[in-house]
A protein has these predicted regions:
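N-terminal export and membrane-targeting signals
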Residues: 1-22
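Surface-exposed, charged secondary-structure patches
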Residues: 3-6, 89-136, 237-276
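C-terminal motif of bacterial Sec signal peptides marking the signal peptidase cleavage site
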Residues: 26-30
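Bacterial signal peptide processing site
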Residues: 32-35
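Core segments of small alpha/beta cavity-forming domains
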Residues: 40-92, 167-236
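Primarily mature extracellular domains of secreted and cell-surface proteins
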Residues: 48, 68, 75-76, 80-84, ...
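Short beta-strand edge/turn micro-motifs at domain boundaries
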Residues: 130-193, 253-261, 290-333
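Intrinsically disordered, low-complexity segments enriched in Gly and acidic/Ser/Thr residues
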Residues: 216-301
Length: 333
């Protein structure tokens, strides 16, 4: 469903002489050597980013055609890896011979939003057209060290008209926004907690979110579609995702706000008056542990991209642009 990333290829000619020059310069001036952990540098070379996207596409096509989750794990991580990995695992259980009718994913008309960053992990965004539909895909690639391969951690799907206007610095690089201490209405690192509080309590949980299908609409769907009956009761639980395993990332927009990618976790438990629970979805059955005598609980991960306004933008609220929720496991009791 998504694309994958290659190991960057770095030129090695004249490495020794360049290192020697850098050492002499630092000895004379007292500066520090420019490493990813010490200085503000581009997250990825402009020639390496396309190679990462190409590698991603190659591996994800192989993984999806063979239905091999171990291949998928080589190029995906975070929310995207959790959702796609579980999906491929389930489809493999139901189709162990693979997917011979799979149509390869291809990317085109790509631009790369590369921030300059200090320290690790590093990340960048590919904004690309794809062979699946007419929408734009935003893929966030990340890695924890120079020795690691780039892996995609987020996918967001936007109509061309939804793409915001990104800010750039004096050198043309995208401008990253930290997870805290910003001038935004909601700090990027707090979005998961604020959003899940809203889902549980409405405006009592948070008043930061604009009405829409993934906010007021989702709460209304839970109240109506899953209203309790004499035969079945449905319960929901929502919580922010681990900020290390599912790190949020954000880019500054020209209007002073930010585009933020973040992750949440969700549970839906259905308990029946008289069991056993009949599960008709083969993918749920493939991921099920335990015996659903009276109840089944679905565990899901959701990846979201939102526009967060500046705190000074009076009356503005957080707006959802895309949300992808996927089943990662299920249990019966």
């Amino acid at each position: 469903m998504t694309a994958r990333a290659p190991l960057p290829i770095r030129p090695r000619r004249r490495l020794s002489s360049l290192a020697a020059l850098a050492l002499l310069a630092c000895t004379a001036t007292g500066c520090v050597t420019v490493h990813g952990a010490d200085a503000v540098v581009p997250a990825v070379g402009k020639a390496d980013a396309p190679a990462a996207l190409d590698h991603f596409a190659q591996v994800v096509n192989d993984a999806d055609s063979k239905l091999d989750p171990s291949l998928n794990a080589q190029v995906e991580t975070g929310a995207l890896g959790a959702i796609d990995g579980a999906g491929i695992k389930a489809r493999h259980v139901n189709s162990p011979s693979g997917n011979p009718g799979y149509q390869p994913l291809r990317f085109s008309d790509t631009r790369f939003l590369i921030p300059r960053e200090r320290g690790w992990p590093k990340w960048f965004v590919a904004d690309t057209a794809n062979s699946r539909d007419r929408d734009r895909w935003l893929l966030v690639f990340t890695r924890d060290s120079v020795k690691d391969a780039w892996r995609a951690s987020y996918l967001s799907v936007l109509a061309p008209g939804q793409l915001p206007d990104f800010a750039t610095d004096g050198q043309g690089y995208a401008v990253p926004v930290p997870v805290g201490g910003t001038d935004l209405l909601v700090q990027p690192g707090e979005l998961g907690a604020r959003y899940t509080a809203y889902l549980q309590q409405g405006d009592k949980g948070s008043t930061a979110f604009a009405q829409g299908s993934q906010t007021s609409g989702l709460r209304a769907q839970r109240r109506t579609q899953y209203a309790p009956t004499s035969q079945v009761v449905t319960q929901f639980a929502d919580e922010p995702a681990d900020p290390v395993q599912y790190a949020p990332v954000a880019l500054r927009l020209r209007d002073g706000g930010a585009l933020v990618f973040f992750t949440t976790r969700h549970e839906m438990k259905q308990t029946v008056a008289k069991g056993p629970v009949v599960i008709k979805d083969p993918n749920v059955n493939a991921l099920l542990t335990g015996t659903p005598n009276r109840s089944v609980t679905l565990y899901k991960v959701a990846e979201q991209v939102v526009k967060v306004p500046a705190r000074s933008d009076a009356g503005a609220k957080v707006v959802f642009l895309n949300r992808i929720e996927g089943l990662v496991s299920a249990s019966g009791a």
